[in-house]
Amino acid sequence: MVDEFIQWLSAQNWKVIPAETATPIPEDVLSRYGHAIPQSWLNFAGKLAKCEDQTGNKWFLVGPDFKPAKTEDDWSWNELELMGLDAAGKDKKWAKEVTDFWDTHFPIYLCTD
């Protein structure tokens, strides 16, 4: 099923670059979300180095995306959570609501359109 989905994405003109070696999801991410991540998604994410649409504005998070951002312009895998925490500022109740939400919602896809 994973290979068929990758083939389908390629047929839709997505830029799908296989990983030279499998890139596992980091342990800190797995410890937070591992109980809820389907094995099929781990297989998909580990097989690819990149998976984005033609514009580069839509992408599936894959193994290398879970490494820390290298520059301020890079999107972190948990960028939406970070933005929410930044918006919450010193409001601890709001920050907890943001964290609680992201504790139960694992991001697999981002879009900047």
What does each model-identified segment do?
Residues M1-T112:
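A surface-exposed partner-binding patch
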